[in-house]
């Protein structure tokens, strides 16, 4: 009989929600596994007691679907106003082996282009790949892949759009062309959770997350709530780009996410070697320096595969 592990528990209950929109996974802690017996606590501070009991029964029913489970113990806790919050367990994304972020502190450096290139190249190498466009306020992935359709849903799950053999999800699929998304941080963070965890991924080897610029709420939400395998940093030769990228590097180092490497985009136009300088200063591998060419811009505008123009030495950095 196989041993139980925490991921099985999280996967089974991750879609259970309270009426206020709180996901059960956001308020559980102290997961204990002893043989075939499992238990954990639910923080029901501010929740209706009857609803909490309904949620508990739903969780028990879902967990009983795991054949190895014998006994389930779920207890309720309530935090005192000044009580330090117990660190939440990080979520695994169902049916995804590895999650790689593509990030930069600076906007307009080509994160979406590089996210697309990485995904396309991995797909050509026979990996199963998906992309989450996490740039809520400026989604570019639908344009790069030429997608103009709204994803279907099945059994309450979002079915990602398939383009160039890559599974793709973006907030851009759900808004009208050129419409501004005017959301505060908590709403944007909740949307990211839904794009990651409510989407029905099909046994992916890699999920690439195209991050927004900056180091704000969305970054913290993803970093604090998900098991991640690393981040690729994108920069350009300009000094102002380097300044913002340093802030991004600082964020990922403080939160202990492995920085897999740096890609310098729009290279060779200026003498400043931002990617090489950052690589040496922070002891981070320089994966590649990508030239700025009209062909790359044209490929993005016409939704053509970027792998016809470029190849990155990815595999030794993503293992």
Swiss-Prot record:
Coiled coil: none annotated. SUPFAM superfamilies: P-loop containing nucleoside triphosphate hydrolases. Pfam families: ParA. GO terms for molecular function: 4 iron, 4 sulfur cluster binding; ATP binding; ATP hydrolysis activity; ATP-dependent FeS chaperone activity; metal ion binding. Keywords: ATP-binding, Hydrolase, Iron, Iron-sulfur, Metal-binding, Nucleotide-binding. This is Iron-sulfur cluster carrier protein. Belongs to the Mrp/NBP35 ATP-binding proteins family. The keyword Hydrolase applies. Homodimer. ATP binds at residues 105-112. It comes from Rickettsia conorii (strain ATCC VR-613 / Malish 7). The gene is mrp. Gene3D superfamilies: P-loop containing nucleotide triphosphate hydrolases. One of its GO terms (biological process) is iron-sulfur cluster assembly. Binds and transfers iron-sulfur (Fe-S) clusters to target apoproteins. Can hydrolyze ATP.
């Amino acid at each position: 009989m196989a041993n139980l592990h925490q991921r099985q528990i999280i996967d089974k209950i991750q879609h259970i929600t309270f009426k206020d929109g709180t996901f059960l996974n956001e308020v559980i802690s102290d997961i204990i596994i002893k043989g075939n017996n499992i238990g954990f606590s639910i923080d029901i501070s501010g929740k209706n007691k009857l609803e909490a009991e309904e949620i508990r029964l739903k969780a028990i029913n879902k967990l009983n679907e795991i054949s190895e489970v014998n006994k389930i113990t779920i207890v309720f806790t309530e935090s005192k106003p000044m009580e330090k919050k117990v660190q939440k367990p990080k979520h695994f994304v169902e049916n995804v082996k590895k999650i790689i972020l593509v990030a930069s502190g600076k906007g307009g450096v080509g994160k979406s282009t590089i996210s697309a290139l990485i995904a396309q190249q991995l797909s050509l190498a026979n990996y199963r790949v998906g992309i989450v466009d996490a740039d809520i306020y400026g989604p570019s992935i639908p344009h790069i892949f030429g997608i103009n359709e709204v994803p279907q849903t099945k059994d309450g799950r979002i079915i990602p759009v398939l383009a160039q053999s890559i599974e793709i999800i973006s907030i851009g699929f759900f808004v009208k062309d050129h419409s501004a998304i005017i959301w505060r941080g908590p709403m944007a963070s909740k949307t990211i959770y839904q794009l990651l965890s409510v989407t029905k991924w099909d046994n992916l080897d890699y999920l690439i997350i195209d991050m927004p610029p900056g180091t704000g709420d969305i970054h913290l939400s993803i970093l604090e709530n998900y098991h991640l395998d690393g981040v690729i940093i994108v920069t350009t030769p300009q000094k102002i780009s380097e300044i913002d990228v340093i802030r991004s590097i600082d964020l990922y180092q403080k939160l202990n996410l492995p920085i897999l490497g740096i890609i310098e985009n729009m290279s060779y136009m200026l003498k400043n070697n931002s990617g090489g300088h950052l690589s040496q200063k922070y002891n981070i591998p320089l994966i590649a320096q990508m030239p700025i060419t009209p062909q790359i811009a044209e490929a993005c505008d016409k939704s053509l595969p970027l792998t016809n123009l470029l190849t990155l030495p990815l595999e030794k950095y993503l293992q």
